[in-house]
Amino acid sequence: MGAKKTDFSSIQKWTLLSTILASSLVFIDSTALNVALPALQKDLGITGTQLLWVINGYALFLSALLLVGGSLGDLFGRNKVFLIGLGIFSISSLLCGISQSPLQLIIARSFQGVGGALLTPGSLSILSSQFGAESRGKAIGLWSTFSALTAIFGPVLGGWLAGMGLWRVIFFLNIPLSIVVFITMIVKVPESRNPNAEKLDVWGALLVTLGLAGITYGFIESPKYGFGNLLIMFSLLVGGFALIAFIIVQRYSKYPMMPLKLFKSSTFSGGNLLTLFVYAALGGVELNPAEAG
């Protein structure tokens, strides 16, 4: 008896296309930029520390606001928050491309992280809402496969553009892709939200943002100052205690941002584990000589 064929509806196909393109923005931008860093550094006269913050300013805001972005999507509408994130990401990409100083680029990259925090969790949550149990695994598999391919393609593109002195084009490419995703999402993909999300878990949002920001900042600055530095230890301790408090709050909150029972679902845990591996791979790609010491 042959395996049952999974056919996607028209809405599901457009949803898959939109989320793949949106994720491609983030993956290509991250991996292509890594290869173009030497050209960028030479053009803008960026110091080693500033170069680190071009990358890590993005990572700090992305990691700190990631769960908040997902929670806002459940509460106010996944498409709405996704598109707001897409708008922030594309506008900040334009600002990155026209930056004339290291400070301008670092600030624009930080706003890219804010946009990515609204955009990234939206991709998977929109997929999960539009695909049933039978087709969800296949859809997430396709999403992750194409995301991996774009992560591989990114360095090739970045090296080619950097070689021609066109590193700014890496950021400008996000604009037409964002327009395509924006139109497709509005016209073809219906809005969805979590019907059980009644209000924002404010304490959870504050604790998880503080926790992730503290941990991320501590690890970002540890190569420069060392783990024995008081600021680094304080940052890591505050971040760690905040995340522990976040878990406790989620256990007893009436409106938890991240219900702990979700981890009993193999689909949820597997999807998040897959995302972790993909972004861990990107984190490895983003290491540069300055970071490696």
PLM feature spans:
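Membrane-interface helix caps and helix-loop-helix hairpins in membrane proteins
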Residues: 102, 166, 191-198, 222-228
